[in-house]
């Protein structure tokens, strides 16, 4: 999800020291933009980049500059969000809830998105109709909220 719908289409930064990269000169103080969407959908980096395929991350062995949903590089030396782990954990919890604890239907929706809106997300958001809480979720809810009925 973070590759397909990055939080922002790009990130800005200022060059800290003069350098050359692939024939281009970057002067200290210059504002540069990191194209998150373009890098996360680049066909030289991603096989079938327009395909949503979470399995591509199972055994990730590529560079920390290839997958850049929240900046690139290592946390301690690069420009990667130090809170990225929190985003990943929240998404894991939500995906577990959706996959294991709720019965729902995904409503018809508009999955187009704007490259100027932050955060980047489908035009209609994510719409769903909750049909039922599965027993596992009901038991967990009852344990934490004794005395409250949930139907």
Predicted segments with their positions:
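Conserved cytochrome P450 K-helix/beta-meander segment immediately N-terminal to the heme-binding cysteine loop
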Residues: 35-62
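Cytochrome P450 heme-thiolate "Cys pocket" and heme-binding signature region
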Residues: 45, 58-101, 110, 114-118
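Conserved cytochrome P450 K-helix E-x-x-R motif and the immediately C-terminal K′/meander segment
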Residues: 1-24, 68
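A generic secondary-structure signal for well-formed alpha-helical elements
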Residues: 5, 9, 98-106
